Regions:
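Extended acidic/charged loop-beta regions that coordinate divalent cations
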Residues: 161, 174-202, 238-284, 325-328, ...
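ATP-dependent carboxylate-amine ligase
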Residues: 1-21, 42-45, 55-58, 86, ...
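Short acidic/polar active-site loop segments enriched in Thr and Asp
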Residues: 69-70, 114, 166, 190, ...
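Short, basic phosphate-binding NTP loop
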Residues: 2-117, 126-137, 159, 330, ...
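Phosphate-binding loop of NTP-binding sites
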Residues: 11-15, 97-232, 236-244, 305, ...
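Short, polar loop motifs at secondary-structure junctions
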Residues: 73-79, 232-236, 253, 404-408
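Short gly/ser/thr-rich secondary-structure transition/capping motifs
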Residues: 24-33, 98-101, 149-152, 172-177, ...
């Protein structure tokens, strides 16, 4: 591949992003690339990004002091002559954010191997991890690290691809229209996966139709020779199919799906087995996670594998070896036979419903639920939080504590659902939430915590773990 740090001439870098090389030697190779002066290596090119709360142009001095060999800046922000030495590279562009995406697109094309893009309202991170676990059994696979799924994180992930990678599995997130479309242009995927569509990010998208349209940007930007993997059990799929020119493979539990699950069995309190059916093949698999939603995630990953002619053995082993990410329905066994279910990474109405449905099946003496606000729900926020409170009451909870701007609606919904006043509490901070849970939990109980990322309920998780202590055997990563 031509795209290789240490060999890429700065003139080619400038050409890839439509920039003007106003200073520096054209043939000088760019040794590396960074948008963060704290992580910049000697000889790297520093790209000065701008955001709502930061401006990389304010850190050009730090970049130089860290050993940067050049900078990419927006037009008219700096004067090239301020940089001493003719060997120092200065490239100017209209937008450094667009330049980052354009460079990643060029890099992806030069890399030229199979790339899978995954989006959806729920389950995209778990599906990404499952898919990468499967593919890595057969080939060296790059996957999105953490939550690098936006207009900055996805390009940076692509720019870390090397000739040693045979495949890439990238996650795409969004909270407003146009983001998925741009991410798809940059990633140029061979396979696109939409896990499901639900009423999330309503603040930026308006309603479910807006969500469907935003997620469909993935399909609209993919070319006719590509493959779309869609949730055949999702009501939105029919609309999505009409927006795509390529081949479609559906997954789900319904008989009409190309990839489906049969003979589902619970093999432990937090594990299950099932058969994956594809064409005439039946493949028995096991996953160390509970819930139908995780079967759907596994089916999506298996569908990707089938499209890439990955062996059934790799599917079986990849799913068996899969370990979920922190804060995504992790079961932690505490002293006193207390189960703490950490689902604090994020929350929306549909993911909360699926999680509570699964919690209801747990063996437990009593159930305590702590919920943080579900953000970005727009004008529907009050109603959806009230409904979530009713859902909590229906779960047979013995104590419920809520936190956040719409915490009162959660409590009101729980009261409407039948919870007495002594069974509910509206906390004003993380410490209060922890104190209420600590005062009401008994031996053998299960504690379930969930909230939007911005609520940072992992602080409550830490406080509970520190207070009660993790039992011998430690963290049960859903097994």
């Amino acid at each position: 591949m031509c795209a290789e740090w240490g060999k890429l001439p700065v003139r080619e870098l400038a050409s890839a992003i439509g920039g003007s090389l106003v200073s520096g030697l054209e043939d000088m190779p760019a040794r590396g690339f960074s948008t963060d002066t704290r992580k910049l290596g000697v000889g790297d090119i520093f790209l000065a990004l701008r955001g709502e709360n930061f401006d990389g142009h304010n850190f050009l001095g730090e970049a130089i002091n860290a050993g940067a060999a050049g900078v990419i800046v927006e037009n008219d922000t700096v004067k090239p002559e301020k940089f001493s030495g003719k060997n120092f590279t200065v490239i100017t562009v209209p937008s450094t954010l667009k330049a980052l995406g354009d460079l990643a697109l060029w890099w992806r094309r030069e890399w030229g191997k199979k790339l899978i893009a995954i989006t959806g309202s729920n389950g995209k991170s778990t599906t990404k991890e499952m898919t990468a676990s499967i593919l890595s059994k057969q080939a060296h696979t790059m996957k999105t690290p953490g939550n690098f799924n936006n207009l900055i994180g996805l390009p940076l992930t692509i720019l870390s691809l090397t000739s040693g990678h045979s495949m890439a599995v990238l996650e795409m997130g969004m909270n407003r229209a146009g983001e998925i479309g741009r991410l798809t242009q940059i990633a140029n995927p061979d396979i696109g996966v939409i896990t499901n569509i639900a009423g999330v990010h309503l603040e930026g998208l308006g309603d479910l139709s807006g969500v469907i349209k935003a997620k469909a940007e993935l399909l609209e930007e993919m070319h006719s020779g590509t493959i779309a993997i869609l949730n055949g059990d999702d009501n939105a799929t029919e609309k999505l199919i009409s927006m795509f020119q390529g081949k479609v493979i559906n997954f789900g539990l319904g008989k009409m799906n190309s990839v489906r699950a049969e003979d589902i069995k619970r093999t432990g309190e937090h594990a299950q087995s099932f058969d994956i059916i594809f064409n005439d093949e039946r493949v028995p698999v096991s996953i160390n996670l509970p819930g139908v939603h995780n079967i759907m995630n596994a089916l999506a990953g298996a569908a990707v594998a089938y499209c890439l002619s990955v062996s059934s053995e790799s599917i079986v082993q990849g799913l068996a070896d899969f370990k979920p990410l922190k804060g995504r329905f992790q079961v932690i066994v505490l002293n006193g036979d207390i189960q703490l279910v950490d689902d604090t990474y994020n929350a929306n109405p549909s993911s909360l419903k699926a999680a509570i449905q699964e919690i209801k099946s747990f063996k437990k003496t009593g159930l305590l639920i702590g919920l943080g606000e579900m953000m970005e729900l727009g004008k529907e926020a009050s109603r959806l939080h009230f409904n979530a409170g009713e859902l909590v009451a229906d779960a047979g909870v013995k104590f419920f504590v809520a936190l956040g701007k719409h915490g009162q609606q959660l409590i009101e919904g729980a009261s409407k659902g039948g919870l007495a006043g002594a069974q509910t509490c509206l906390a004003t901070n993380h410490i209060e939430m922890f104190d209420m849970i600590k005062a009401n939990v008994k031996e053998g109980d299960t504690i379930f915590l969930k909230g939007s990322r911005g609520m940072a309920l992992e602080k409550v998780v830490k406080a509970i773990k520190d207070h009660f202590g993790v039992s011998k055997g430690g963290l049960v990563l859903n097994n």
